[in-house]
Amino acid sequence: MCGIAGFQGKGSREDAERMIARINYRGPDLQATTMLGNTGLAHARLSIIDLSHDADQPMSTPDGRLTIVFNGEIYNFRDLREGLMRTGHPFRTSSDTEVLLHLYAEHGEGMLPMLNGMWAFAIHDARDNSLFLARDRMGKKPLHHAQTSDAFVFGSELKAVLAHPGISPALDLHAVNEYLTF
């Protein structure tokens, strides 16, 4: 079990570090953060597939265009990797994380139906400063998010989201009323 957290908008590296520190037990092997303009990405790693430091996250493509934080396991990543290698994609790790980066580079959001597994991830594209989040169809890997007036915030657990200074843990009574009305 790994953990991811991050934001796009108002925030700092310290905010990303505080967010991932709240869920550091999800990844005892390494906690790391990166800032990409106004986007902060953080990862708590539990090494399973590729134990090398080359597979540490946040992970970027060699050209730095795409950066990912990923929690989960892609069961068919070896088959996907073979197909990508046939089309000229080079790999430096044996991790399923790197396969996701190359799949996104090749197919964009169209990659999702190709995935078999359990996952939650965020991919930042430096080309247009976009942030793409996805989780598996059944929601086995959690991915919580919140929108404020100046930031989009996400994390594997609510604790990480609430650690961002732009998020207030106050109860929104209007939202509760909407939820309970049927």
What do the PLM-derived regions correspond to, one by one?
Residues 1-182:
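Cysteine-centered catalytic environments shared across enzyme families
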